[in-house]
């Protein structure tokens, strides 16, 4: 489990990205890079890091399921993820 402060910081970044997304888009279309520079750093979508929604783990992230490989494996074995089953051939 990731530190709660790291998870909270990432959620704050996500909110800032959503808040400034429209303004950022308009400024880019106008080519006003000076105004873009004055926006908060955390409002840039490139600063976002994918984290597991259950544990907050930043590595081993599966985009399709929005969780880490470890959480995915646990839930898949329990049958809590629809459409996922253990492969065999």
From Swiss-Prot:
Described function: Binds 16S rRNA, required for the assembly of 30S particles and may also be responsible for determining the conformation of the 16S rRNA at the A site.
Family of the protein in this entry: Belongs to the universal ribosomal protein uS14 family.
Keyword RNA-binding attributed: yes
GO CC term, one of those recorded: cytoplasm
NCBIfam families, A to Z: PRK08881.1 (NF006477)
Subunit and interaction comment: Part of the 30S ribosomal subunit. Contacts proteins S3 and S10.
Taxonomic path: Bacteria, Bacillati, Bacillota, Bacilli, Bacillales
Native source organism of the sequence: Bacillus pumilus (strain SAFR-032)
Recorded superkingdom: Bacteria
The UniProt record lists the keyword Transferase: no
Protein name per Swiss-Prot or TrEMBL: Small ribosomal subunit protein uS14A
InterPro entries tied to this protein: Ribosomal_uS14 (IPR001209), Ribosomal_uS14_bac/plastid (IPR023036), Ribosomal_uS14_CS (IPR018271), Ribosomal_uS14_sf (IPR043140)
UniProt KW keywords: Ribonucleoprotein, Ribosomal protein, RNA-binding, rRNA-binding
């Amino acid at each position: 489990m990731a530190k709660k402060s790291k998870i909270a910081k990432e959620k704050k970044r996500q909110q800032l990205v959503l808040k400034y997304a429209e303004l950022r888009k308009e400024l880019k279309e106008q080519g006003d890079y000076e105004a873009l520079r004055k926006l908060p750093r955390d409002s840039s979508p490139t600063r976002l890091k994918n984290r597991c929604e259950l544990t907050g783990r930043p590595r081993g992230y599966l985009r399709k399921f929005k969780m880490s490989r470890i959480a995915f494996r646990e839930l898949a074995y329990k049958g809590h993820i629809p459409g996922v089953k253990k492969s065999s051939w």
